[in-house]
Amino acid sequence: MGMWEEASDTGMKGKKKDKNEEEEERGKKERMVNLTLEMIYLLTGEHYIPRKKSDDGGALHAPGSVIQKENNKNDKKILELMSNIIQLLTGEVAIRTHHVSIYFSLDEWDYIKGNKELYEEGIKEEPQQLRPQACEYKDESNVTAHMEATLCCNSDGNFINPENPEISPGEQPPPANGIKEEATSSEEGNQSDCSINPLTEEIQGTDTPTPIMGCSLNYSLSDNYISDEIKEEETSCQGRNQSDCSITPLTEQIQGTDTPTPIMGCSLKDNKYDGNPHWSPKNTLRRKYSCNECHEYLIHKRDFGKHQMTHKREKSFSCSECGKCFLNQLCPDRHQTGKKPFSCSKCGKCFAFLSDLTVHRRIHTGERPFSCSECGKGFTRPNALIIHHRTHTGEKPFSCSECGKCFSKQSSLVHHQRTHIGEKPFCCSECDKCFASSSELNIHQRTHTGEKPFSCSECGKCFTNHSHFAHHQMIHTGEKPFCCSKCGKCFASSSDLTFHRRTHTREKTFSCSECGKCFSNHSHLARHQMIHTGEKPFCCSECGKCFSSSSGLTAHQQRTHMKVKPFSCSACGKCFSNRSHLIRHQMIHTGEKPFSCFECRKCFSNPSNLARHQMTHTGEKPFSCSECGKCFASSSDLTFHHRTHTGEKPFSCSECGKCYSKKSSLVHHQRTHTGEKPFSCSKCDKCFASSSELNIHQRTHTGEKAFSCSECGKCFTNRSQLSRHQMIHTGEKPISCPECEECFVSSSQLTAHQQQAHRMVKPFSCLECGKCFSNRSNFARHQMIHTGEKPFSCSECRKGFSNQSSLARHQMTHTGEKPFSCSECGKRFSNQSHLARHQMIHTGEKPFSCSECAKGFSNQSGLARHQMTHTGEKPFACSECGKCFASSSKLTAHQRTH
């Protein structure tokens, strides 16, 4: 369109020259020009005609005549003309309130007329801002003079709908889609004194707002104001009459520059403006204004004032269902109804607001217009860039009033504050489980649907959420970007690093409200609390067995039903159902024990063993048995103990059918069938079926006796020996015979009693002499008589013994130690059995009687020797002369004759 120029009343000749052009430009364009000329005449009293530029690029100007207009009549006429222009361009109806011009489609206007009460309060919300992204122009002389228009009020201060003057615009309801606004302000003078703003409108079928007159502008809605989808532009008029206002190009100072730039009349090419006060393309941002509420920095005073209003605005519109508050009436309506009128043409996904759809489309196009000046990373939203920028600056402007913890995002603070108040507003419709955030609810709902939308391109494994997927991919890449400043150890995720750092500080910020136990991370606390509640939400679809964690369910399914063990050890070929078990196993080969006790510096291969060990220092036993009140350091120990009351033995051997209460006991038993002894001593190369046996054996080389009795100070190489010893002081005999109810200190004593007194089976028989034994240890000890093996030797005299207890008794002859004393006569003995035998002299007790002659004996060996007089058995033969004897002592005495 040619430039607008003033002309006098005598300039009618120009109109005649343009008749040919007007005939060619019929239709909507001609109508818009005529309506605009008429509107300018009503506003200024001057005639304007369109003319082409002169050859030298100058604009022809002719002074026009000025007339006195009647304001009230003209205002109404201007409203009608403006409405006609808008309808010609967009098919929308415009109304004017006290502060904003708002544009509605014809369908929306029908809705407004039927629901005016709902709109009366909603229209009072503060409008949001639509900003131009950038502006470039070569020559200001090439820029057309800009048409500016503002809908004005009548003399009574009321604004009239041109389609229906009887309806006040202030009574209109909100439209079904986004609202476009154009805000004005007047400081001195009346409404008619306001300057004239460029009219912008979003052309239907496009995504970007376009000015009605002037040039084509590229606008982007600032994501800081997307919630209401309101677009605005501010102007002010400093107390002038409307007739004095000149029609000048509306300028906007683009952030990051120092010169005002015309908004209209040029073609915008640079789309790098992102509305982010922290960033400018040339990194020349001047931070003039700082918000005391959220520490946000802004360049312009006008933007600073607007930003502060976001803190002052009340969210007066609340949802009747959940109580959530919103800034305007439109948001709770969409929130309650779930209406999403804006759909993506690519994937069909729907959105409640047009701005959300605009941002979503960038996923398909790959457009990331907002880039970080530090690292170059791109983002689809400017607020995402602002949040990202804080990772470089370390800024965390949002702090919790309860604990003082700081966050870089407002949403993170809100989510954190729910941990203090316990609020979980998002509930699952399937199982009624509630969550603190909608994202957690969405991830949880996938456990019901089984949806795993994130799949790994390397191994095909699928995940329910993107964070797990990203964490998994680092396994393939080996990337560990998060390093500990204390020890230099690196991790794949920041959460793993945070958890690791607590091993240095020993910080345990999460405590159980039931028992007071503290944990270093929230997931461990949640898992622990299920012990108190008994909750096991993860059930196996095959057998119905329930678990407290999804990892437990997965391990169960792989181990029991699928029997899949995809993780194999490269050293020994052993397979495992999950990676953590493989990593723990590999530490056996490497000898790595990264977890050390702060008290005694003892090291462990996994944190659970360390935690269990630390309870030996603190004496803490938080898990108590409901049957007998006995306390335990771990829940697994309590579970094993419960089985002594119930008699449950869920683990059975496939070879012989023998059952066990613990899986480890079954594994140890199965090695008796396979003969496997994977644990070998580095000193003597002796092999053992379990690591505990190896540890006990290694103490014979080191002489270490780590377990000491608090009563008498006696030391033992393993805990079981100490426990058995302590029963001497306490008199406790927890194992009872079901036949005669006699009590014993250990299960081995009970077994021996049952075999002797109740004629139980003795499955282990000696191939040399045919003697039978009830347990393997006694059988192994007996075989040493035939082989002559004596693996335990005295360090003083080098005398050998077939078992460690005999060696211990012998060593007391060198030390002279006799810790057991008789309460009757004070005589002391080197071992408990000798004391017990001696005490029978005082009591006269002879519990062992001969079945042949009923003679009584105080000990079993005396009875055995006596029975040989009835049978005539003489098992001990002299190797020199072949003479036989009933006892080894007599054989020894005889051998001295040779």
Curated annotation (Swiss-Prot):
Alphabetically ordered keywords of this record: DNA-binding, Metal-binding, Nucleus, Repeat, Transcription, Transcription regulation, Zinc, Zinc-finger
SUPFAM superfamilies: beta-beta-alpha zinc fingers
Region of interest (Disordered), ranges: 1-30, 160-211
One GO BP annotation of this record: regulation of DNA-templated transcription
A GO MF label: RNA polymerase II cis-regulatory region sequence-specific DNA binding
Entry keyword annotation includes Metal-binding: yes
Compartments, as annotated in UniProt: Nucleus
Compositional bias of kind Polar residues: 186-209
Zinc finger regions, C2H2-type: 289-311, 342-364, 370-392, 398-420, 426-448, 454-476, 482-504, 510-532, 538-561, 567-589, 595-617, 623-645, 651-673, 679-701, 707-729, 735-758, 764-786, 792-814, 820-842, 848-870, 876-898
Taxonomy, superkingdom: Eukaryota
Main location group: nucleus
Cellular component aspect of the GO annotation: nucleus
UniProt key word Transcription regulation: yes
A UniProt-annotated Pfam family: zf-C2H2
Family: Belongs to the krueppel C2H2-type zinc-finger protein family.
Record's function text: May be involved in transcriptional regulation.
This protein's name: Oocyte zinc finger protein XlCOF7.1
Organism ancestry: Eukaryota, Metazoa, Chordata, Craniata, Vertebrata
